[in-house]
Amino acid sequence: MKSAEIREAFLRFFEEQGHTRVASSSLIPNNDPTLLFTNAGMNQFKDCFLGAEKRAYTRAVSSQKCVRAGGKHNDLENVGYTARHHTFFEMLGNFSFGDYFKRDAITFAWTFLTSEQWLNLPKEKLWVTVYATDDEAYDIWTKEVGVPAERMVRIGDNKGAPYASDNFWTMGDTGPCGPCTEIFYDHGPDIWGGPPGSPEEDGDRYIEIWNNVFMQFNRTADGVLHPLPAPSVDTGMGLERVSAVLQHVHSNYEIDLFQNLLAAAAKAIGCSNDGQASLKVVADHIRSCGFLIADGVLPSNEGRGYVLRRIIRRACRHGNKLGAKGSFFYQIVAALAAEMGEAFPELKSQQAHIERVLKAEEEQFAKTLEQGLRILEQDLAQLKGDVVPGDVVFKLYDTYGFPMDLTADIARERELTIDEAGFEREMDAQRERARSASAFGMDYNSLVKVDSATEFLGYDATEAQGKIIALYKDGQAVDQLGEGEQGVVVLDRTPFYAESGGQVGDTGFLQAGAARFDVRDTTKTGGAFLHHGVVASGALVIGSPVEAKVDADVQHATSLNHSATHLLHEALRQVLGEHVQQKGSLVDSQRLRFDFSHFEALKPEQIKQLEDIVNREVRKNTAVETELTDIETAKAKGAMALFGEKYGDTVRVLSMGGDFSVELCGGIHAKRTGDISLFKIISEGGVASGVRRIEAVTGAAALAYLNAAEEQVKEAAQLVKGNRDNLIDKLSAVLERNRQLEKQLEQLQAKAASAAGDDLSNAAVEVKGAKVLAARLDGQDGKALLALVDQLKNKLGHAVILLGSEHEGKVVLVAGVTKDLSSQLKAGDLMKQAAAAVGGKGGGRPDMAQGGGVDVAALDQALALAVPFAEQGL
């Protein structure tokens, strides 16, 4: 059976057993901030197992894409060198949420594996482990399923603590836990290794193919296990492992799926496909990289983006080792999409995006890869011992972009190790250097803890009656706030929108009789809305009734900008591609700021397209509609949810232009798209690797921006004695005239330099048979000095030259050495000394170098270094 057939058979089998087929979740966990990547099938069902989430089904089956690279679960260093380690793998799993338990889970697994209708594995090849004290599971296996006792193994607490066992699963120190039973396949006596639980269990003969976890206890802090009222089942079977069994091969890299990727990798690199570890690395890494990029991760220097960058660069290094010339990795994406695109359509829909991202990253790394490898070779040649020092590893990381594990990979091939502790010390020192020395004041608002909740009325009103239920000053609860005091007011009900989803909190005021509180910001903690501000008059007391009034004009302007971000988001996806995801936003009354995932700067025509699309929707003047529904229904309607956001049982779906833009959002918005009036992008740029930022204005602010631009056009026209109609022609004429004058100036400077050269050559002194000339020519730029040094080298014939100039308040230096002397004296070395003397830097070739500095007063001192430099080197 092919891998795709095994996947489909598994899903179909459990559907026939009453399970709901659930699509794989993203590799970016959206409900677990502790998890770097999705690494197991149960991740998306975690809240179901904890009882925090109820779904319409109690039985589920899935084929989950998983990544283990970085963080606690990290297989990266072993990938390519073993038969079964991968950065990406598929986990087939069936799950029960308080439905069936051990008997059915065991029966399902055995039936699927051994039945002639399904996988038809020979029963005598299968071994089973259970937790040492799990007699229930043992009896089901031996008495009901019929597994002989000689192929049953009880595994106890083999990890040094109670319930610390390969066959006892825990979610943490406390919480749901329980025993598990694992099924192993015996590859036969030709392969070394012993059965599970034996001293030789780490061999490759007996391979685990399926794990059934029985969540039947809740462990409390005292270590006591309490039975759960509704036990559950979580299982996992690696698709690659079971494919190897069914295709009668020992290594996962020999299965059909990998054979196709290995062939594509060999073709892209231009090497033979004969089982090299490096080729396996490339074939494995294209899967993790392709899927991560499809799920919204982009290469960067932190978090998930850095893990992706590490994997890409490891693949590039192994391709380089195999002889790859130029970019090759991105060329394998087509084979990946062909192999796995039917099961995971995102690979096909985002193929072009994945290729662009990989190619850009490859090209960036290629600039330093060769140089970094040469530096490493030099350091290894001088190495005494078998440990690469931490400072060398750090230099490669900091200067040449080599992740630590890439250097470790190279060291491993030479039977060397790296000094990880030394590398971390260098990293800590760098962080300390970068850490700001600024002292920050206490954020008292972070101390505010409120048990009460506030009823929000702001979707329908900007004014409301309420009552003060809590007051805070400097983070501490108080009974009243007096005139002039700053603090926080909590009401039982409010029309003020609290900062969320990028939209700033509302401003306005609270009136309590003669007392007035100016609200400068509104935030939220738990269910309570915090009104931050100052008492303008009178005093506020807990229990007092208040009239809450939002600054409606400011809120309205903010709402227009918020609605515009939704239109912009969809426009970006249409113009740039579906890989675009929101990475952050800030919406206030003045402008909007929208951060999104993209790998390159936008072209002017793309920015114009975005403006045209958004303004087209604005002119349609369609109603902005909202609907409250459950998350699954919202997603079925195509509503975009933000990665990393946690959504409750009920979500608010906001639609614009019919189905043009459909997003989950709790913010304040325009009533109709026409209220936005006008949308204008005012800037676009990068804020991080793979993240771009657009700033834009709407409504009156957009009109003001265009009016200001019109005034600038008028002023420019007046400066060149033209008008709006002929401004471009006038400016072109001015620029052309300027180019002509610059050319004439260069010619005059060249003549002056030539004349100066004749005079300067007479000022050279002789040092050990060579002419040495150091001279100061203030007012000359670097270009003029370079030309003059070339001229002087020709005139003097056997010479060392150092020229300096004060130009626009800074020092400019140029050094030259005639070729017959450049093996003894290097211009770059002279420049380093001279530039350092004027507080700057410099360098260059052995025969010509440039530099500069900021200490004009030290220029003469720097020039005086030329003679002793020549004396020492000749």
UniProtKB/Swiss-Prot annotation:
Names of the cofactor(s): Zn(2+)
SMART domains the record matches: tRNA_SAD (SM00863)
InterPro entries linked: aa-tRNA-synth_II/BPL/LPL, Ala-tRNA-lgiase_IIc, Ala-tRNA-ligase_IIc_anticod-bd, Ala-tRNA-synth_IIc_core, Ala-tRNA-synth_IIc_N, Ala-tRNA_ligase, Ala_tRNA_ligase_euk/bac, DHHA1_dom
Source species, domain of life: Bacteria
Residues holding Zn(2+): H562, H566, C665, H669
Record-stated family: Belongs to the class-II aminoacyl-tRNA synthetase family.
Domain remarks in the Swiss-Prot or TrEMBL record: Consists of three domains; the N-terminal catalytic domain, the editing domain and the C-terminal C-Ala domain. The editing domain removes incorrectly charged amino acids, while the C-Ala domain, along with tRNA(Ala), serves as a bridge to cooperatively bring together the editing and aminoacylation centers thus stimulating deacylation of misacylated tRNAs.
UniProt-listed HAMAP family: Ala_tRNA_synth_B
GO cellular component: cytosol
Keyword Aminoacyl-tRNA synthetase: yes
Reaction it catalyzes: tRNA(Ala) + L-alanine + ATP = L-alanyl-tRNA(Ala) + AMP + diphosphate
Protein known as: Alanine--tRNA ligase
Phylogenetic lineage: Bacteria, Pseudomonadati, Pseudomonadota, Gammaproteobacteria, Pseudomonadales
Database matches in SUPFAM superfamilies: Class II aaRS and biotin synthetases (SSF55681), Putative anticodon-binding domain of alanyl-tRNA synthetase (AlaRS) (SSF101353), ThrRS/AlaRS common domain (SSF55186), Translation proteins (SSF50447)
Cited function: Catalyzes the attachment of alanine to tRNA(Ala) in a two-step reaction: alanine is first activated by ATP to form Ala-AMP and then transferred to the acceptor end of tRNA(Ala). Also edits incorrectly charged Ser-tRNA(Ala) and Gly-tRNA(Ala) via its editing domain.
Subcellular location: Cytoplasm
